[in-house]
Amino acid sequence: MEGLDGTGKTGLVRRIVSDLKSQGFEVVRVRVPTDRIRRSWMFQQVHNLNIQSDVDPLAYEVAYMADRLQLSGAVIKPALDQGKIVVADRYLISSIGSLLVRVPELLDVIETSYTSSGWFNELVSNLVQPDVSFFLHSDADVAMTRIAKKKDERAFDLDANFYRHVFNLGKSFAVANEMVLLDTTNVTAVNINATAQEYISKILRWSHADT
């Protein structure tokens, strides 16, 4: 489940996990960045202290990729091998979703990494590939209003035009990788969940047919 802050992504993940468990499936929920990197010095500097000058943008993106690789190999793959379903709150394009809206200085590094860097694409090929990926998006003003209402969200300056630029970057990558686009601007959480569940049900039917 990919998407920028303010699109309802985490809430949708919770509903999907709950629905799958109610159907009797064993479900593992993961999120990117993981708690491991959230406790790191770099993450604390950028997200909690709002200090970007001491953090090299490329080093930060490499750390994010290492976090994804560790999660993929040590958590996701073993869970799938055990027949469990894994639902990820951000995964492949987590940098676009969680970093750029807070740290615009990372734009050049992340944009280059996602569009033309051989090292990035080579590392991505080592990640467990999702059976289905969703990219949630919303009108910038609506998303920023949602962000402002989150009690646990550290205040940070968010420019609507920059948010739109980041969204367009994420959307282009999502389209190129055949992700399912879900617009959450004027749609209820119940309806968004129902749409997502249609795709998930198809995947589960295909998986059952293969076995």
Give the positions of each predicted feature:
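ATP-dependent small-molecule kinase phosphotransfer cores
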Residues: 25-115
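NTP-dependent small-molecule kinase module
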Residues: 15-17, 141-211
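Walker A/P-loop
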Residues: 10
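Hydrophobic/aromatic beta-strand patches that form the interior of the parallel beta-sheet core
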Residues: 28-30, 87, 132-134, 180-182
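Hydrophobic anchor at the beta1->P-loop junction of P-loop NTPases
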Residues: 1
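A glycine- and Lys/Arg-enriched "phosphate-lid" helix/loop adjacent to the NTP-binding pocket
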Residues: 94-168
